[in-house]
Amino acid sequence: MKHLIIFLLFPFLGAAQPIISCTDVIKPYADFESPLAFEETVVALQKELNSRGITIFATIDHQKAAEAVGESMQPATVLIVGNPKVGTALMQENPRFAIELPLKILIYEEEKTVNIRYEKIAAIA
């Protein structure tokens, strides 16, 4: 009988817990507004990353991919980036880091504003 009461009350106990946004806990991001146009932002960011010795492993143009299947969307590009020397050291210390690397940077346009978003390193450390 005791187990039946606990089982019946369990859904209500969960409702008493504070609501926490998953995005705050799981994926805290840094967001910035770019003063440049979309393409200028992508090029400037690529140049800056290269000047700092950061490898750009891939550039994914989501708008172009959408157009390839007959769809349209706002400009959005993801840069897959990293520094193999730093990444290797992190993965040697903790192999689970491999799921988070390489890092991703999103450049997107929303309501005529160009934004840059990336995951804070502290969130995965």
Specify the residue positions occupied by each region the protein language model found.
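Hydrophobic alpha-helical segments with strong N-terminal bias
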Residues: 4-5, 30, 86
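Compact, glycine-rich, soluble single-domain proteins
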Residues: 46, 50-103, 107
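Beta-strand/loop substructures that line and gate deep hydrophobic ligand-binding cavities in soluble
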Residues: 104-125
